[in-house]
Amino acid sequence: MKTMKLLRYAVMLVFVLASIRVITGASDLTSTGTASAALLLSVPIVLAALGGLFSERSGVVNIGLEGMMIMGAWAGGYIGSQHGPWAGLLAAMIFGSVGALVHAIATVSFGVDHVVSGVAINIIAAGLVRYLSTLMYKNGAWPGPSQSPGIETIPVNGLPVLSGGSYFGWKSPDLLGSIANLNWFFISDLASILRGLTGDVSYVTMVAIAFVPISYFILWRTAFGLRLRSAGE
């Protein structure tokens, strides 16, 4: 029942956006690129939200999420520029976890106020990565400490049949893309948005979005999740 209600709201939203596109002529409003960019930019927010969800459910107020993500982003950029994107992703996870570990030890083991610890991590992380950037890039290996290093892109793919992509040498049809190119009111707008959300999506984005239902299952459908939520209560 709740799922159907959400679907109705989603369809109504697409209809409103399609109407605005026709009235204003803003073709990018429902374009594939706009939907794809929105999905890509939502990944850091989703990951931070999931981190905050687990922290809150365990009884820890985690204001230091920003600092942890800053640390992970720096490590991912530096290691990724040296050893490739997958090594950079692993380094980002490890370096970000260090910040989480510091917060956990400070609040749980030493009883430091959660807000104070979180704010401290945010401040320290910002200064730490600035110092590390100056230290690592001072010899001209990169234009400067304020410039992001170049990293190879992680491969992308699409939903078979619906959004194109390539699977084991087989080139999948792009049904949604074909419908989007027909320029039918609402139908093509809906297809264009769905094409942006399911086509040319990075594997990391796929995993990040998959973490949402997985986190729900862990927290509300497993014994571990029950114990975690009980500890937070």
Named regions from a protein language model:
Residues 25-31, 193:
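Membrane-interface helix termini and inter-helical loops of multi-pass transporters
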Residues 95, 121-125, 211:
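Transmembrane alpha-helical core residues of multi-pass small-molecule transporters
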Residues 42-43, 50, 124, 128, ...:
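Hydrophobic/aromatic residues within the transmembrane alpha-helices of Major Facilitator Superfamily
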Residues 33-89, 93-115, 119:
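Single transmembrane alpha-helix segments in multi-pass membrane proteins
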Residues 214-233:
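Membrane-helix/interface signature in polytopic inner-membrane proteins
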Residues 14-27, 71-78:
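Membrane-embedded alpha-helical segments in integral membrane proteins
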Residues 1-13:
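N-terminal membrane topogenic signal
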Residues 126-219:
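Transmembrane helix-bundle core of multi-pass membrane transporters
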